[in-house]
Amino acid sequence: MSLNLELDPLTLRKVFAQHPSGVAALCAELDGEKTGIVASSFTVGVSLEPALVMFAVQKSSNTWPKLRDAGRIGVSVLSERNEGVCAQIASKNGDRFRGIETTGTDQGALFVDDSTLWLEASIYNEVEAGDHWVVLLEVHGHRTSGHLPQIFHDSQFHSLPVPELV
């Protein structure tokens, strides 16, 4: 097998888009203002003791420096019921949370309603990785809904088929 050796950013984006992933919204309320980012790089099960998850964020992000200051971050793994939420929270214009139902905690974590999984977390460690930060989060609480997750593959959102009972 011969491999393509082109490693420029545009080519890599297309190649990496072939890996299906869930999408997480990482949000908090700081001084009365809702802030958040979305990450298709979100990964669970990094560690069970302590309970750690992780995601990667571009160093050029304008939102991460604000979110980094939150005591607690709400991680919402988006479900098929959250259509359009990812694009809206990732938007650079307007009110990123207009029309999005959210629930907050006393510690400032902010969750997107109707998601498939919610985790309340705090920053455990942050590691420089090229043009990104890899952020490890310690999980302090969790809840699941039973909704099917939204899947990001080939730069498009997909839903899993509903399992049929035999």
Description of each model-found segment:
Residues 1-166:
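Basic, polyanion-binding surface patches
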